[in-house]
A protein has these predicted regions:
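A short, structured active-site edge motif that brings together acidic residues
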Residues: 44-45, 49, 123-139
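Conserved H-loop
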Residues: 39, 63, 124-128, 156, ...
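Acidic, Mg2+-coordinating phosphoryl-transfer loop and its flanking beta/alpha structural elements
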Residues: 161-200
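Structural recognition of alpha->loop->beta junctions
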Residues: 122-132, 192-212
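Conserved Lys-Pro-Asp/Glu-containing loop-to-beta segment of HAD-superfamily phosphomonoesterases
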Residues: 9, 139-170
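Short, acidic loop-to-helix structural element flanking the phosphoryl-transfer center
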Residues: 79-105, 111-115, 143
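Active-site neighborhood of HAD-like aspartate-dependent phosphohydrolases
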Residues: 2-46
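A metal-dependent, Asp-based hydrolase signature
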Residues: 35-36, 47-78, 87-95
Length: 212
């Protein structure tokens, strides 16, 4: 079993890790591409999915001049839909707080959306730091977001773990030289997690409590 005794801080990806947004996100993509008059290839989406939307747009053949419009449409359509927490997420986060872990979020999602969902789920007091797309010049898997969180919290990588559901999350944590936890989700690339060798691989977020 991995030694987690030095870990005092847990940073979480948001989509697919804390909130069950895979289906909602896909619907938002479908509606956005339809509004732009661009065919949406589900097979290509599954193969190319990444927290970096622009790599998805590129793989799906969306012209670069439409990327910003696609972003705006996605946020609009996503906002029309309801997002629920991952099963057991709220209870797990509450228990980690009770165990005195410092918690934060590092997400590729837009700040307005992630903060809104944190508020809706009554998690505002649970997270000391929230880093979103707007605060990261370099996107996942570049470690900038994690480095910014460490700096804001005044802690080191040696006492920090990053929890995420995508290969990019694991690579991001590895490039930041911190302990990584992969958690399965319904996102298309989640099955690739094992190939990226996270320090801990779990099937559900609740399993974190076996390690921390």
């Amino acid at each position: 079993m991995v030694d987690t005794s030095e870990i005092t801080t847990l940073l979480f990806d948001w989509d697919g890790t804390v909130v069950d947004s895979a289906g909602v996100g896909l619907t938002a993509f479908e509606r956005s591409f339809a509004a732009l008059g661009v065919p949406f290839d589900h097979d290509l989406y599954r193969e190319a999915y990444s927290p970096n939307w622009y790599s998805v747009y590129e793989a799906l053949g969306l012209p670069k001049e439409k990327w910003q419009q696609a972003d705006d449409l996605w946020v609009h359509h996503y906002g029309e839909l309801n997002v629920e927490p991952i099963a057991g997420a709220l209870e797990t986060i509450a228990e980690l707080k009770r165990r005195n872990y410092r918690l934060g979020v590092v997400s590729s999602g837009t700040e307005c959306r992630v903060l809104r969902e944190i508020e809706q789920l009554a998690l505002k007091d649970s997270f000391e730091i929230v880093i979103c797309n707007e605060q990261m010049k370099q996107k996942k898997p570049h470690p900038e977001g994690l480095q910014s969180a460490l700096s804001a919290l005044g802690c080191t990588r040696k006492v920090t773990a990053y929890v995420g559901d995508s290969p990019e999350d694991i690579e991001m944590g590895q490039r930041a030289n911190m302990l990584t936890v992969g958690v399965r989700s319904d996102y298309p690339t989640s099955w690739k997690l094992k190939n990226h060798n996270p320090d801990i691989l779990i099937e559900s977020l609740g399993e974190l409590l076996h390690y921390f």
